[in-house]
């Protein structure tokens, strides 16, 4: 099958991870999955939510949003509408769950890290790009907190990497990392979150046009796990590069 951008079915879009985009945030990343661009910041706060106090454990949470003109037509800011949409809540929770899957909250101590993921430009896969970029921002924030002695030395707060990718069936063919034009045509659409050692954190799959069978599900999961392996390697490469390189 010939894809819109010339990729093979199992090929990621060009992925770039640029650290240190904000001089204020303890961790910050601009991540690009092709034309999808998401700005992720990680902010460290000493203390935890009231319901977490006295537990000795930290907390990691996330917020997701899209800039008004991140898509083909402008959308009002949700703050102007006076209500956060269901999709925004869902994706924010997904990002938070994904990151907490690889955090040892006990090692974090009673500290909170908030990830803000803002979509600058959308061309499919914004939530998967957000998760992948947010992990790198989180890693930088954890390193900053350890350097400042806010997080105690000893146990490692990060237990693994985590990344996410979209897969889908378009015109009967399983594809990795769908752009927007592929996403809207997909008979099946799925988002998969994996840890660096290949375990699944979340699998969100929907038959948009036609039901999918067990064989197709297996093919999609195989594509997704291979894609997440590649993304984990890119995350590791980004984290070993100096920010001014």
Swiss-Prot record:
Belongs to the RNase PH family. It is an enzyme of class 2 (transferase). Its EC number is 2.7.7.56. Keywords: Nucleotidyltransferase, RNA-binding, rRNA processing, Transferase, tRNA processing, tRNA-binding. One of its GO terms (biological process) is rRNA catabolic process. Disulfide bonds: none annotated. The gene is rph. This is Ribonuclease PH. Phosphate binds at residues 87, 125-127. It catalyses: tRNA(n+1) + phosphate = tRNA(n) + a ribonucleoside 5'-diphosphate. NCBIfam families: RNasePH (TIGR01966). Phosphorolytic 3'-5' exoribonuclease that plays an important role in tRNA 3'-end maturation. Removes nucleotide residues following the 3'-CCA terminus of tRNAs; can also add nucleotides to the ends of RNA molecules by using nucleoside diphosphates as substrates, but this may not be physiologically important. Probably plays a role in initiation of 16S rRNA degradation (leading to ribosome degradation) during starvation. It comes from the Bacteria. It comes from Streptomyces griseus subsp. griseus (strain JCM 4626 / CBS 651.72 / NBRC 13350 / KCC S-0626 / ISP 5235). SUPFAM superfamilies: Ribonuclease PH domain 2-like, Ribosomal protein S5 domain 2-like. HAMAP family: RNase_PH. Pfam families: RNase_PH (PF01138), RNase_PH_C (PF03725). GO terms for molecular function: 3'-5'-RNA exonuclease activity; tRNA binding; tRNA nucleotidyltransferase activity. PROSITE patterns: RIBONUCLEASE_PH (PS01277). The lineage of its organism: Bacteria, Bacillati, Actinomycetota, Actinomycetes, Kitasatosporales. The keyword rRNA processing applies. Homohexameric ring arranged as a trimer of dimers. CDD domains: RNase_PH_bact.
